[in-house]
Swiss-Prot record:
It is a multi-pass membrane protein. PANTHER family: PHOSPHATIDYLGLYCEROL--PROLIPOPROTEIN DIACYLGLYCERYL TRANSFERASE, PROLIPOPROTEIN DIACYLGLYCERYL TRANSFERASE. It comes from Streptococcus pneumoniae (strain ATCC 700669 / Spain 23F-1). Catalyzes the transfer of the diacylglyceryl group from phosphatidylglycerol to the sulfhydryl group of the N-terminal cysteine of a prolipoprotein, the first step in the formation of mature lipoproteins. GO terms for cellular component: plasma membrane. Its EC number is 2.5.1.145. The chain crosses the membrane at residues 9-29, 41-61, 80-100, 109-129, 167-187, 197-217, 226-246. InterPro entries: Lgt. It comes from the Bacteria. Pathway: Protein modification; lipoprotein biosynthesis (diacylglyceryl transfer). Belongs to the Lgt family. A 1,2-diacyl-sn-glycero-3-phospho-(1'-sn-glycerol) binds at residue 131. The lineage of its organism: Bacteria, Bacillati, Bacillota, Bacilli, Lactobacillales. This is Phosphatidylglycerol--prolipoprotein diacylglyceryl transferase.
Length: 262
């Protein structure tokens, strides 16, 4: 089993979980700022947004996690803020981040679709890296399996939990997001009929579908009417993505807008 603590500086422990999230954030900010000028967005506005959105998204992710496990946290109030032990629900962070983005874009007079389009691939790569925090914490895993011989030894050993090998669902989602990120880069360069909002829609559909399938492999999720809560949200994401495609195809606004068209 790998030590979840990456660096120990006296009483201060820096965990791999935090490093994975911060690394994903830094890469996401870099990629978003690089793409921003092509969408007529000032890169400094991206930094201003991150300074507001990131802590609120972390809070939203934690709040979502605690709410759906309130039976436990109501008896362990001291653990509610112990995010260093894990327990950040991605959907909570995404919903909070999207709300902050909408408000921020409105106040900065930035087209919301443009902001969402440049944020979507960056969020996807950040999620891909962030899932490795679950790996180090030995959480967000799936059902027991006989063996994991197809995986590298360090992953196989870390997925040996409570006397059994577990499905490395963190890895499946990480790779799924990485593939989605690569496809977005290809679409942006090669898809001539790409419309404003299409990248956002692709993210919602791609991530929603992958999460719905992978979530079905997990054993630690809350059930609601026969599906896990995250699977229901995945259905909502897919539905929103499809509606965005239909709506934006009618608008016919190209992905990159010139000043004259804007």
């Amino acid at each position: 089993m790998l030590d979840p603590i990456a660096i120990q500086l006296g009483p201060l422990a820096i965990r791999w979980y935090a490093l994975c999230i911060v690394t994903g954030l830094i890469l996401a900010v870099y990629l978003t700022m690089k793409e921003a000028p092509r969408k007529k967005i000032i890169p400094d506005d991206i930094l201003d947004f991150i300074l507001v959105a990131f802590p609120l998204a972390i809070l939203g992710a934690r709040l979502y996690y605690v709410i759906f496990r309130f039976d436990y946290y109501s008896q362990n109030l001291g653990e509610i803020f112990a995010i260093w032990n894990g327990g950040l629900a991605i959907y909570g962070g995404l919903i909070t981040g999207a709300l902050v983005l909408y408000i921020f874009a409105d106040r900065k007079l930035i087209n919301t679709w443009d902001f969402l389009d440049i944020a979507a691939p960056s969020v996807m790569i950040a999620q891909s890296l962030g899932r490795w925090g679950n790996f180090f914490n030995q959480e967000a895993y799936g059902a027991t399996v006989d063996n994991l011989d197809y995986l590298p030894g360090f992953i196989r050993d870390q997925m040996y939990i409570e006397g059994s090998y577990r499905q490395p669902t963190f890895l499946y989602e990480s790779l799924w997001n990485l593939l989605g990120f690569a496809l977005i880069l290809i679409f942006r360069r090669k898809w001539k009929s790409l419309r404003r909002g299409h990248i956002t829609a692709f993210y919602l559909i791609w991530y929603g579908f992958g999460r719905m399938v992978i979530e079905g492999m997990r054993t630690d999720s809350l059930m609601f009417f026969g599906l896990r809560v995250s699977q229901w949200l995945s259905v909502v994401f897919i539905g929103l993505g499809i509606m965005i495609v239909i709506y934006q195809n009618r608008k016919k606004a190209p992905y990159y807008i010139t000043e004259e068209e804007k």
